[in-house]
Amino acid sequence: MLSPDLPDSAWNTRLLCRVMLCLLGAGSVAAGVIQSPRHLIKEKRETATLKCYPIPRHDTVYWYQQGPGQDPQFLISFYEKMQSDKGSIPDRFSAQQFSDYHSELNMSSLELGDSALYFCASSL
């Protein structure tokens, strides 16, 4: 919906200055991985936290980022609450796994280039 206070060109420019973060498979799907929030739009330089609840009894969590028109990029993984592998995760991002095995991906100082699909997976 367009803002009545801004001409179309100004609205488009303002929209381009926002960062859109989406999670694949957000919500509950037949006892699979649960991710939240489903989608998120933030301003540049803001922070965001994405949550991943693994399949019950799975103790390993993997985070991925997929930018527009790109292949998924591995960010980081955890096994039994410890970081087990690190991929191309920006310094502005951090992640952790908690005692109930859910994980959070924290992103600070968001940039337009962070606009992407974020998803997590779990395994035994």
UniProtKB/Swiss-Prot annotation:
It is found in: Cell membrane. PROSITE patterns: IG_LIKE. GO terms for cellular component: plasma membrane; T cell receptor complex. GO terms for biological process: adaptive immune response; cell surface receptor signaling pathway. Coiled coil: none annotated. Keywords: Adaptive immunity, Cell membrane, Disulfide bond, Glycoprotein, Immunity, Immunoglobulin domain, Membrane, Receptor, Signal, T cell receptor. Residues 32-124 form the Ig-like domain. Residues 1-31 form the signal peptide. Glycans are attached at residue 106. Disulfide bonds join 52-120. SUPFAM superfamilies: Immunoglobulin. Alpha-beta TR is a heterodimer composed of an alpha and beta chain; disulfide-linked. The alpha-beta TR is associated with the transmembrane signaling CD3 coreceptor proteins to form the TR-CD3 (TcR or TCR). The assembly of alpha-beta TR heterodimers with CD3 occurs in the endoplasmic reticulum where a single alpha-beta TR heterodimer associates with one CD3D-CD3E heterodimer, one CD3G-CD3E heterodimer and one CD247 homodimer forming a stable octameric structure. CD3D-CD3E and CD3G-CD3E heterodimers preferentially associate with TR alpha and TR beta chains, respectively. V region of the variable domain of T cell receptor (TR) beta chain that participates in the antigen recognition. Alpha-beta T cell receptors are antigen specific receptors which are essential to the immune response and are present on the cell surface of T lymphocytes. Recognize peptide-major histocompatibility (MH) (pMH) complexes that are displayed by antigen presenting cells (APC), a prerequisite for efficient T cell adaptive immunity against pathogens. This is T cell receptor beta variable 13. It comes from Homo sapiens (Human).
